Structures are given as C-alpha cells and as structure tokens.
C-alpha cells in the first residue's frame, strides 16, 4: 500500500508539471474603465429599437471599441506585430468611413451603388477570413461575370462622391486608404479584381444611429438591404452557409464532440494501458491553444479555465488511482479471506478427528480399567492362596482346616462365576482338594 500511494504522488506531481506546458500565453492586461459605461449606453439605446437594429448597433459599438483598443495597445501587451496592427487599423478606418458616409448619403446614392458598396464591404470581410480565399476565384469564374475596367471606374466614381461629402479628417483617412490600395495594386496587379470586388454580400448591414435616422432613410436602408440580399443570393449556397456558420457562436451543450482514441504499438512507444482522461485533457488543451483569441483578457480567462480543468482532471485521476489501489487491496483481502476460511475448515476437520480419537481412547481406557481390575483380583486371589499355603504349613492340628478349605472353595467359586475362569479355578480347586486330602492322611 505504501508503494502504491508513493507512485500516485509521483504521477500527480508529474502531471502538475506537465499541465504548465499547455498554457497559451502569459498575458498581463487591464480592463478599460469606460467599457461598462459604453456597454450600458449601447444596451440602453438598443432597447428603443427593433431586434435587428439592436444587433446592428451593438456591432457598431463593438467595432468602435475594438478600433480604440487596437490603437491603444502597445508592443508589450499586443499579440500582433506592428505591420499587422497597421493593416488592422487601415481596414477598421476604411470600414468606419464607408459606414458613416453611407449613412449620410443613403438618400442620394442609388440602389446599384449601395449594392456595389455591400460587395466591397463583403470583400473586406472575405479578405479577413482566409478560409474563403481559395473558393472566391472559382465563384468569379463560374457564377458572376464582370468587366474589370468598368468596375474600377465605378468604384473610383463612388469614392470621389464619398470624398466630396466627407469632412476634412475623414478625407485625409480616405486618401491614405486610397494610396495604400494603389500601392497594393502596383505590387499585386493580378489580384486587383479579387481585392476590390466580391461575389458575396454580407447578410447583415450596420444601421445608422437611432437619433440621426429618419423614416425615409430607414425605408431606403431596407430597400438597400433587400437589393443586397438579392445580389448575395447569386453566390453558392455552401459559401453562404460557411460564412454564417463562422459567425454563429455555438454553446457547449449545443453539439456533441466525438473523440476517438488510438493505442500506439510497442514499436512506437505505446503501452498496454491507455488513460482516457489524459487524452481528453490533452485534446482540449491543444484545441484551446490552436484557437488563440484576439483579446488578452479572453486568453487570461482561457488560461484560468484550462488550469482549473487540469486540476480537476488530476484530482479525478488521483481518485481513480486510489480507487484502483483500493479495489486491488479488496481483491487481495478477499483472496486472503478465502485462504483463511480454507484453513479454518481444515482445523475443524482436525478437531473432529481429534474428538473421534478421544472417544476411542476413552473406550480403550474403559477396557484397560476392566482388565486392570481383573488382574488386581487375580493378585488378591494368589495372595490369598499364599496365605492359605503358609497357614497349612504351620498348622499342626486340624481343627480349622475344614473352615480354611471352605473359605478357599467359596472364594474360588465366586471368582470363577464373576470373571469366567471357571475351568482354571475348577482345576485349582481339584488340586487343592487333593493336596488337602494328602495332608489329612
């Protein structure tokens, strides 16, 4: 038992040392104090709108907060490089400018321009998701034919109209964005159509703020949404399903995960025993490690979650090890109990045999006691004979000879009747009578 408990402690210490290797990152972070206030303001403004506009306003707030958070991150706390941060900032600025200008010019821009705007914004989203990059060229070749020069001209005209209606600071941002796009087109001339236009339109449009929107703008916006949905219906069904599935957050209880465990061979370093809990723990830790989040506090929360789950799994494994040790000890005790029961049955059989021998010895003792009594009686008889003989030798007269002879005769007859020595005693009596007759003559 002591060796088993020692092995359990060693295994627990080894697992605790190995659990530290599955931590994702050691990130120190501090929450923004205005985060709760922004969330409360966004939720209070969204309560006065419909569910669709509610969700759109929450997306606006979350995107603006992500923009400010990314701009405030320094090199020590950021998980991106400087070039990645600049690319993210450019994309966020372009999305914000297109969103704000689409709200101001939604009454003047035609439905075709809105559809092209939805296509350009969808292209930015598809560019962020590398998962759809290999399918985009196939869609452009097969489903949606378009001319390269005309689309570039219409996009230039649309961007010039946006520059005219934009404030100075936004014009500066747009000019920097255009310069970055021109440099990208010079470096990658073959990907101009792929980066400017897309065959897929997003299913959700960000609505304008509730305080600045009018009923007419809302109606125009609903018509633009319908047109964008019509254009997006031209895309293949599987691509739309994949984009929607990527945005949906599925809970832990909404789907089942099937894990198949394979046991390694002896040549590959495998053993006969396979611990399922260790494999499940390693699977979840590697899954969380591969899906690294963008926010540092999510990394911190996942690290704490992995640590707590690892500790609980280690405790469960320790309990299973202790249960295994106790079960083996119980089996050993049961086997020992059976052996003791067999020994006890043998002892009982020996006891019965001793009792039988004791009874036999008692019977033999009774027989020997009877024989001893018989021998004692014979000794008494011979002693009496000796006394009679001595008396007969010393007697000179015969007044009492008849009395002595009669006593001996009576004693001999009694002895022969009691012990079955009648023939021997009869012979002895005849000898005595002959001796007595000779003595008298």
From Swiss-Prot:
Residues 160-173, 192-201 have a biased composition (Polar residues). One of its GO terms (cellular component) is kinetochore. Pfam families: CENPU. InterPro entries: AME1 (IPR048743). It comes from the Eukaryota. Residues 174-183, 217-233 have a biased composition (Low complexity). GO terms for biological process: cell division; CENP-A containing chromatin assembly; mitotic sister chromatid segregation. Signal peptide: none annotated. Residues 160-240 are annotated as: Disordered. It is found in: Nucleus; Chromosome, Centromere; Chromosome, Centromere, Kinetochore. Keywords: Cell cycle, Cell division, Centromere, Chromosome, Kinetochore, Mitosis, Nucleus. Component of the heterotetrameric kinetochore subcomplex COMA, which consists of fta2, fta7, mal2 and mis17. The COMA subcomplex is part of a larger constitutive centromere-associated network (CCAN) (also known as central kinetochore Sim4 complex in fission yeast), which is composed of at least cnl2, cnp3, cnp20, fta1, fta2, fta3, fta4, fta6, fta7, mal2, mhf1, mhf2, mis6, mis15, mis17, sim4 and wip1. Interacts with mis6 and mis15. Component of the kinetochore, a multiprotein complex that assembles on centromeric DNA and attaches chromosomes to spindle microtubules, mediating chromosome segregation and sister chromatid segregation during meiosis and mitosis. Component of the inner kinetochore COMA complex, which connects centromere-associated proteins and the outer kinetochore. COMA interacts with other inner kinetochore proteins to form the inner kinetochore constitutive centromere-associated network (CCAN), which serves as a structural platform for outer kinetochore assembly. Belongs to the CENP-U/AME1 family. This is Inner kinetochore subunit mis17. It comes from Schizosaccharomyces pombe (strain 972 / ATCC 24843) (Fission yeast). The gene is mis17.
């Amino acid at each position: 038992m002591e060796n088993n408990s020692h092995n359990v402690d060693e295994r627990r210490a080894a697992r605790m040392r190995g659990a530290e290797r599955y931590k994702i990152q050691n990130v120190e972070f501090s929450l923004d104090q205005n985060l709760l206030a922004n969330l409360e303001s966004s939720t209070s403004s969204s309560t006065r709108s419909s569910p669709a506009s509610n969700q759109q306003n929450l997306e606006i707030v979350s995107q603006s907060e992500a923009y400010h958070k990314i701009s405030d991150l320094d090199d020590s706390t950021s998980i991106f490089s400087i070039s990645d941060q600049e690319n993210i900032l450019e994309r966020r600025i372009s999305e914000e400018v297109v969103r704000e200008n689409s709200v101001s010019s939604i009454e003047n821009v035609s439905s075709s321009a809105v559809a092209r705007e939805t296509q350009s914004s969808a292209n930015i989203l598809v560019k962020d998701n590398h998962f759809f990059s290999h399918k985009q060229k196939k869609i452009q070749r097969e489903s949606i034919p378009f001319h390269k020069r005309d689309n570039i001209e219409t996009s230039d005209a649309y961007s010039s109209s946006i520059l005219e209606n934009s404030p100075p600071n936004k014009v500066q941002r747009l000019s920097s964005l255009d310069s970055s796009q021109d440099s990208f087109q010079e470096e990658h001339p073959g990907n101009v159509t792929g980066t400017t236009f897309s065959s897929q339109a997003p299913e959700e449009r960000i609505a304008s703020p509730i305080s600045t929107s009018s009923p007419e703008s809302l109606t125009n916006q609903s018509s633009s949404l319908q047109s964008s949905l019509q254009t997006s219906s031209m895309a293949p069904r599987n691509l739309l399903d994949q984009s929607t599935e990527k945005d949906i957050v599925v809970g832990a209880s909404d789907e089942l995960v099937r894990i198949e465990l394979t046991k390694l061979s002896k040549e590959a370093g495998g053993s006969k025993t396979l611990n399922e809990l260790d494999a499940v723990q390693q699977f979840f830790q590697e899954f969380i490690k591969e899906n690294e989040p963008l926010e540092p506090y999510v990394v911190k929360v996942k690290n704490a979650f992995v640590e707590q789950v690892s500790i609980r799994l280690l405790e469960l494994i320790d309990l299973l090890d202790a249960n295994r040790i106790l079960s083996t000890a119980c089996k050993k005790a049961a086997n020992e109990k059976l052996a003791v029961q067999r020994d006890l049955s043998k002892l009982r059989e020996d006891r019965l045999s001793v009792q039988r021998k004791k009874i036999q010895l008692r019977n033999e003792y009774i027989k020997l006691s009877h024989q001893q009594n018989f021998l004692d009686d014979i000794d008494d008889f011979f002693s009496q004979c000796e006394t009679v003989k001595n008396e007969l030798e010393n007697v000179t007269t015969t007044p009492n000879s008849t009395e002595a002879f009669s006593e001996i005769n009576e004693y001999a007859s009694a002895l022969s009747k009691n012990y079955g020595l009648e023939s021997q005693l009869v012979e002895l009596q005849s000898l005595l009578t002959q001796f007595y007759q000779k003595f008298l003559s």
